[in-house]
Design a protein with these regions (language model features):
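A short, N-terminal "cap"/entry segment at the start of jelly-roll beta-barrel domains
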Residues: 44-85, 128, 170-177
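Cleavable N-terminal signal peptides
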Residues: 32-33, 43
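Glycine- and acidic-residue-biased ligand/ion/polar-headgroup-sensing regions
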Residues: 92-95, 102-122
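Short beta-strand His + acidic residue motifs that chelate non-heme Fe in jelly-roll/DSBH
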Residues: 97-99, 117-118, 139, 144-150
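Short acidic-glycine-tyrosine-enriched beta hairpin
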Residues: 121-142
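N-terminal secretory signal peptides that target proteins for export/translocation
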Residues: 1-26
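Double-stranded beta-helix
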Residues: 50-52, 126-127, 146-177
Length: 177
């Protein structure tokens, strides 16, 4: 058995083995536990997608509600239907997303690059915070926020569909141009 360097062996000294009245009863408990795990796994399998690496993701242009230049790939669910979804948005350096909000909470994790996000009614680069690779942010439903990039950036967005975006200033909506 290997013990991770991050866990001190002394921490394991307090763990006592489970006492069993017989090897047969222990075997029965293990088999029962395995059956529970397998049946739960089978139920979840229909909802799971195959694991994939970044190179296997299919990218395409973001919907017209996003400024030109962004690409998107949907990893799970359908953002435009009721239910959970996960997508990734790839933006070039200098990309700007004017102040907007969503009817549901938006959760964003930075996969790569530098993603700047701020709260307010107008994009103001002095009011934002920079999130770097691994950074996380969330915008509650209907909270006005804006974003921009300083390098090519990929963010993962997850939330509850249907996804919608409403620009604070309707003239900022690229789908109306």
């Amino acid at each position: 058995m290997t013990i991770s360097n991050s866990v001190a062996p002394a921490q394991f000294s307090a763990i006592k083995p489970v006492q069993s009245d017989s090897a047969a009863s222990m075997l029965c408990r293990l088999v029962a536990g395995a059956c529970v795990v397998l049946s739960a796994s089978a139920a979840l399998a229909d909802d799971m997608k195959m694991p994939m690496n970044g190179k296997e993701m299919n990218w395409g242009p973001a919907p017209p509600a996003f400024p030109k230049g962004a690409q998107v790939t949907v990893l799970s669910g359908d953002p435009f239907k009721d239910g959970p979804y996960v997508l990734r948005l790839k933006m070039p350096a200098g990309y700007k997303l004017p102040a907007h909000n969503h009817p549901t909470q938006e959760n964003v994790t930075v996969i790569s690059g530098n993603f700047h996000i701020g709260m307010g009614d107008k994009l103001d680069e002095k009011k934002g915070i920079e999130l770097t690779t691994g950074g996380y942010g969330e915008a509650p439903a209907k909270m006005n926020h804006f974003a921009w990039t300083t390098s090519t950036t990929v963010v993962q967005v997850h939330g509850q569909g249907p996804f919608a975006i409403a620009y604070v200033d309707p003239t900022d909506d690229p789908s109306k141009k």
